[in-house]
Regions:
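Short Fe-S-cluster ligation motifs
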Residues: 101-115, 337
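Long, highly charged, low-complexity intrinsically disordered interaction regions
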Residues: 320-390, 426-477
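Flexible, acidic/Gly-rich N-terminal and inter-domain linker regions that tether
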Residues: 1-70, 423, 431, 439-497
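Conserved, mostly hydrophobic/aromatic
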Residues: 62, 75, 114, 171, ...
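Canonical Radical SAM [4Fe-4S] cluster-binding loop centered on the CxxxCxxC motif
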Residues: 65-94
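Short, charged beta->alpha transition segments
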Residues: 63-66, 94-105
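Conserved AdoMet/S-adenosylmethionine-binding subsite of the radical SAM
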Residues: 97, 120-351
């Protein structure tokens, strides 16, 4: 159903385009440290851009909207595909600015997440997005966090110019394999999806080298103490993508973007870039998803990879049937595995194999790995290296540091470990203190598996059976409505509400 934007109010547009954006999960903490400035709105430092989350972990402190839900493409999995009969509308750049500034002044939001369907062409769509962001930064002096989805197939110049205005950019790969992409989005070219990712990476590296930093993005401190991590492999090699990322196409941007007020080079995508992959729409295994994730971190230095459990929205023989529950527990396990790649020194081919390509969703991936390597357990807490401690279920990066530091001053026992925050309900099956286990526990896979599943059963059920999925509203956070009373009106008039 086509309804002209002229027929819709700004509030009606907002309801449509905010709802259409809720399936995009690539929102996270800003990663920027830009302070507030005099005569400018917003900052990315004061309280942390993502201090508020919904029950399923999605960030709600950004105004997350689409520029438009119109689209020339017909991706089978997408609610906004051209063949769907939906109300279509598009924000103007000025309308986006109005929304961001007004919501920010009312303390509803701290930043903007902007994506879009493809209106007319990728370049035309990106031009509209660029106009909105440029106005926010220059006319409205908005200094808050901005995350923009780059449109594959757009011009290199637009991506370059946008990179100087935003904190984070991302390009959705959508699916982890070429076969999956051909099946559900045959019009999308894998090379065109990857090209802007490489261009953004080149721009980030050029800027970092220009200001005297290392080419690679900063990673967790824990990686410095690990002997082997995925980030130590495949060092960055510049691959040209056309025009140089630091050559501005628009000469008018020279003073406003390329140089800050203090004359230093302006940042280019300072919070890094991310991507998103849909899980459950096609038949890829967890191994394929995680292997693709590892390559993205290694080859493109992505800051984050996000996973989105597919919610059946369209009828199609190539998709799960309508009403099929989204694989939320599987999504949760992939996020946990992603954490192991980035902070714990694991690799995809360690966590999974061709023989066992999928995680046991009833166990967290670290427990799953430990149960398949019982030959190295139990680990002696008072002697194990930092690398080995990180591979013990129930011991995290901070806990491992505490153990290494504390045992320099004496022998540790289970009471000490409990005070340090070690999760003994998991760790007790895999560790000893001075050669003794916490209890007499048989080191058998079946026994330990039953115990761990029993302890985590309630949590697993809650993840897989959430309350009805709903993006939190900017207007009605608790999803209830009530009539305005005479007393309310009176309080409003006298400034008591």
């Amino acid at each position: 159903m086509e309804i002209s934007s002229k027929d819709l109010s700004l509030n009606e547009k907002l309801k449509i385009l905010a709802d259409a954006a809720k399936y995009d999960v690539a929102c996270t903490s800003s990663g920027s440290s830009r302070r507030g400035k005099k005569e400018m709105l917003g900052n990315t430092e004061a309280a942390g851009i993502c201090h508020s989350f919904s029950s399923d972990g999605r960030c709600v402190s950004l105004l997350k909207i689409l520029l438009s839900n119109e689209c020339i493409y017909d991706c089978k999995y997408c609610l906004n595909r051209v063949s769907n009969d939906r109300v279509r509308t598009t924000f103007t750049p000025d309308e986006i600015c109005t929304l961001v500034v007004e919501f920010y002044r009312r303390n509803y939001i701290e930043g903007l997440f902007l994506s879009s369907g493809i209106v007319k062409s990728p370049t035309y769509t990106m031009e509209l997005m660029y106009q909105a962001i440029y106005l926010l930064r220059t006319k409205y002096h908005f200094n808050g966090y901005i995350h923009v989805k780059a449109i594959p197939g757009t011009s290199d110049e637009l991506i370059t110019n946008m990179g100087y205005l935003v904190d984070r950019m991302s390009v959705n790969l959508e699916l982890p394999t070429i076969d999956g992409l051909k099946k559900l989005a045959p019009h999308k070219n894998p090379k065109k999806l990857v090209a802007p990712i490489r261009q953004i990476q080149n721009g980030i590296v050029d800027h970092r080298l220009m200001i005297g930093k290392d080419a690679s993005m900063e990673r967790s401190q824990s990686n410095k103490y690990l002997k082997h991590t995925i980030f130590q492999e495949n060092p960055y090699q510049r691959i040209q993508t056309g025009s140089s990322p630091l050559t501005l196409a628009d000469p008018s941007l020279k003073n406003t973007l390329r140089l800050q007020n203090n004359g230093k080079p302006a940042s280019f995508v300072p919070a890094g870039q991310s991507t998103q992959m849909i899980i459950g729409a096609t038949g890829e295994s967890d191994l394929q998803l995680l292997s693709t994730t590892q390559k993205l971190y290694q080859q493109y230095d992505l800051k984050r990879v996000f996973y989105s459990a597919y919610v059946p929205l369209n009828e199609d023989s190539n998709l799960p049937a309508l009403g099929t529950a989204p694989p939320l527990l599987r999504e949760h396990r992939l996020y946990q595995a992603d954490w192991l790649l980035r902070f714990y020194g694991f690799k995809a081919d360690e966590l999974l194999s061709v023989d066992r390509p999928n995680f046991n969703t009833m166990l967290d991936p670290k427990c799953d790995w430990a149960l398949r390597h019982l030959d190295i357990y139990p680990v002696e807490i008072n002697r194990a290296s930092y690398d080995v401690l990180l591979r013990v279920p129930g011991i995290g990066t901070k806990s491992a540091f505490r153990i290494v530091k504390a045992r320099k001053h004496g022998t540790l026992n289970f009471e000490h470990l409990k005070k340090m925050g070690i999760v003994l309900k998991r760790a007790k099956y895999f560790i000893t203190c001075s050669g003794k286990m916490m209890y007499r526990i048989p080191i058998e896979e079946d026994f330990i598996t039953r115990q761990l599943i029993g302890e985590d059963g309630k949590q697993n059920w809650e993840i897989d059976h959430p309350q009805t999925y709903r993006q939190l509203s900017l207007f009605d956070d608790f999803n209830f409505q009530s009539e305005v009373t005479v007393e309310d009106s009176s309080k409003t008039l006298f400034g008591q509400m």
